[in-house]
Amino acid sequence: ERRSLAGIPRAYQKYVGHDNNRDFYMASQAETVNMNRVLYREWFPQIVYNHHQTGPPGTVMFAPPFRDPINYVFDPLIPAGINLLGAGMHARFAAEGKRGVTMRDGSSYSTWWNGGLRTTAYFHNQIGLLTETIGSPTPSDIPFIPERQLPTGDLPFPIAPQRWHFRQSIEYSITCNLAVL
C-alpha cells in the first residue's frame, strides 16, 4: 500500500518545514542554533557528514567528490579531504559490489553553495560531506536512463533499472559510514 503524508495536519517544523537544512548560514531556527553551537563551539569535529535524499535519476546515490570548479576560498586541505573521503566511499561501494553511485558531474552538487550543514563546515576547517540517496519506505523503481547505463568517470559502476527498497538505501548509507570511519 502506498504511504501518504496528506493526513499530516502541519509541517513538521513550525516555521521552515523541511528547509531547516538550509538555515546553517543564518541560524534563525532553534535546531540550527543548537547544531551550530555543538559543531563550532563544543565538539569541533573533523568531518561533518550529511545524509540526504534524493539521488539523481538512474542512480542510487550521489557521493563526493563534488563537481568542478571547486570553491577557491577554502584552504586546499578541505577539497583534498573531501576528494579523499569520496574516493574511499566509491572504492568501498565497488568492493562490496554496490552499483549506481555517481559523483562530480553526475549531479549538480558543488562546494559553492554555502548555506547548508556540510558547506558551513568548510568555513570552520572541517570536511563537509553530502550524500543524496534514493528511497523511502514505499518501494520505488530506478528508471532507465540511457546515458547512465555504461560506465563513465562519474559513474564507474552503473546500475540496471530495477525495483528499489528502503533497506537497500540504508545498506548504502551504512557503506558510506564505514568508509568515512
Q: Residue locations for each model-derived region?
A:
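Structured catalytic-domain cores with a bias toward divalent-metal coordination
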Residues: E1-L181
